[in-house]
């Protein structure tokens, strides 16, 4: 998984079309690219390109179904398979298999930027936690080959994943090491129960 913005995104995808699977779009709350504001629109999105071999691990996190979507389909009861007006049972199972209130994730992710950033391209830890949970399980290893200030490492540690980070700049490596060491892993209330 790699972050990018056009025209880099296109070059990234074309560098290995065979392994490119799909992309997410991260919608930020604050615009960027102000130095070019007189010549092009400000950017509030960044692409997240997913690459992998034959099949990429994917553990979708349920998203809430909007009220407007819920209002279009009336639940009429009906046992193990939903019985909805205006939608077949098969269609319901494919689109809303998490239950009446949740559906599959959409490819646009909305997360604000970090308030106290240490690096010019720093990503928000909650966004990275979302992506890590979407593609890995506890105890697996997360690699960030452009670690920067270590936000991916912080997210990985919080989620009980192993982490390998690579950073060329000594200043940012020190910042990342400190942040990751200070991060607290999440605690499960029932992890010791039989």
Where is each model-derived feature located?
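Core catalytic lobe of class I
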Residues: 1-165, 171-175
């Amino acid at each position: 998984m790699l972050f990018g913005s056009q025209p880099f995104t296109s070059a990234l995808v074309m560098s290995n079309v065979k392994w490119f699977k799909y992309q997410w779009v991260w919608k930020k709350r604050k615009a960027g690219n102000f130095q070019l504001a007189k010549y092009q629109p400000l950017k509030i999105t960044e692409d997240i390109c997913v690459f992998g071999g034959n099949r990429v691990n994917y553990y979708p996190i349920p998203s809430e179904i909007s009220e407007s979507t819920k209002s279009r389909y009336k639940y009429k009861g009906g046992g193990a398979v939903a019985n909805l007006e205006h939608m077949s049972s098969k269609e319901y199972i494919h689109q809303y298999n998490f239950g009446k209130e949740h559906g599959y994730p959409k490819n646009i992710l909305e997360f604000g930027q970090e308030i106290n950033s240490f690096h010019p391209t720093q990503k928000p830890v909650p966004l990275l936690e979302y992506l890590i949970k979407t593609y890995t399980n506890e105890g697996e290893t997360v690699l960030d080959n452009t670690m920067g200030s270590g936000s991916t490492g912080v997210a990985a540690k919080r989620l009980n994943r192993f982490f390998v980070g690579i950073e060329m700049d000594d200043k940012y490596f020190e910042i990342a090491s400190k942040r990751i060491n200070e991060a607290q892993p999440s605690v499960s209330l029932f992890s010791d129960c039989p």
